[in-house]
Amino acid sequence: MRDRLLAAEKVKAIDWRDDALYLLDQRVLPFEEVWHRYTTAEGVAEAIRTMVVRGAPAIGISAAYGAVLGARARIAEGGDWYPALEEDMQLLADSRPTAVNLFWALNRMRDRLMRVKDGDDPLVALEAESVAIHLSDREANLTMAQLGADLIRRHQGNLQTVLTHCNTGALATGGFGTALGVIRAAHLEGMIERVYADETRPWLQGSRLTAWELANEGIPVTLNADSAAAHLMRTKGITWVIVGADRITANGDVANKIGTYQLAVAAMHHGVRFMVVAPSSTIDMEMASGDDIIIEERDGRELLEVGGQRVGAQVEAFNPVFDVTPADLIDAIVTEKGIVERPDTARMAQLMSRKHLH
């Protein structure tokens, strides 16, 4: 399966070369393929904030490379450069507060810096660590793809009709994808009849990105309005809802793109299995439950302006980016460390105690 997944890979969103970070601008896909070059931590932070790059794993990887760029500039300035680099890292951390992968990656970079020995080049060490973060995410996605496909086969061996939300493919990660990685693997094994992709308002990641990725790989995909999801479960034989995650708490609650919670509620009502796919770096064992997650809100103009015209001077907007799905609505969380079925605090702790990959 690994070789088949590698052969099928067609999309990437992050490239590190020539001492610079290149990001595919996901705001203009699928109409244009525009790459931006970044040479400063400030530039990378702005790219994360403005969603040039998005998806929790991709954000973490980009932040790690941003830390390298910050270190290069601060070291070149001379003197006591570490406090200035910490300011750069804080700027990166503030760019998207919900995605725990961002903080995980920056903490790894800090830890690596603390382990640099006298006489060694800290910049070389940081660059190696950022590349390792990128490659390990790619490897984790390959592992999760196989584990998720195996889980589908174990529960339902017939052809599957899957519903997914937002974008969780190669564009959102270091390669292959999380939820879309599982869908890719299941398709290669002949288990996918059709994928329904929520359009995912207001940024339309489903219609702009997910449908584009799936169509590029020849996976049958139908785009649907977010509000059609429950109707699809009732009338189109949906067998699985498969989504990613931006943060998973110690009890198995999942923060993901706004609209995920209502999918889980509808799936429970219709007897549709609900799978979350995310690397272990998304799991925050320091956070007890989803009640503690700070939910990012974006500019209300994303909802209030239609065709460049404001809908009403007195109208206000509520525009949260994420919601929290309680663990008791989730059938399985798939990580590179293994699978947790019917997640709870004890099962999550057991998963995270494992020191090796599955």
Swiss-Prot record:
**EC number(s) per entry:** 5.3.1.23
- Annotated catalysed reactions: 5-(methylsulfanyl)-alpha-D-ribose 1-phosphate = 5-(methylsulfanyl)-D-ribulose 1-phosphate
**Matches recorded under InterPro entries:** IF-2B-related, IF-M1Pi, IF_2B-like_C, Initiation_fac_2B_a/b/d, M1Pi_N, NagB/RpiA_transferase-like
The answer to whether keyword Isomerase applies is yes
Q: What's the top EC group for this one?
A: isomerase
Return the HAMAP family for the record.
Salvage_MtnA
Q: Which GO terms describe its biological process?
A: L-methionine salvage from methylthioadenosine
**Could you tell me which pathway this protein works in?**
Amino-acid biosynthesis; L-methionine biosynthesis via salvage pathway; L-methionine from S-methyl-5-thio-alpha-D-ribose 1-phosphate: step 1/6
Function according to Swiss-Prot or TrEMBL: Catalyzes the interconversion of methylthioribose-1-phosphate (MTR-1-P) into methylthioribulose-1-phosphate (MTRu-1-P).
Site Transition state stabilizer: list residues.
166
Positions contributing to substrate binding: 54-56, 96, 205, 256-257
The alphabetical list of record keywords is: Amino-acid biosynthesis, Isomerase, Methionine biosynthesis
Q: Which GO terms describe its molecular function?
A: S-methyl-5-thioribose-1-phosphate isomerase activity
Keyword Transmembrane helix included in the entry's annotation? no
List, alphabetically, the SUPFAM superfamilies matched: NagB/RpiA/CoA transferase-like (SSF100950)
Catalytic residues, per the record, are 246
Give the protein name, as stated in the record.
Methylthioribose-1-phosphate isomerase
PANTHER family, per the entry: METHYLTHIORIBOSE-1-PHOSPHATE ISOMERASE (PTHR43475:SF1)
Q: Which family is it part of?
A: Belongs to the eIF-2B alpha/beta/delta subunits family. MtnA subfamily.
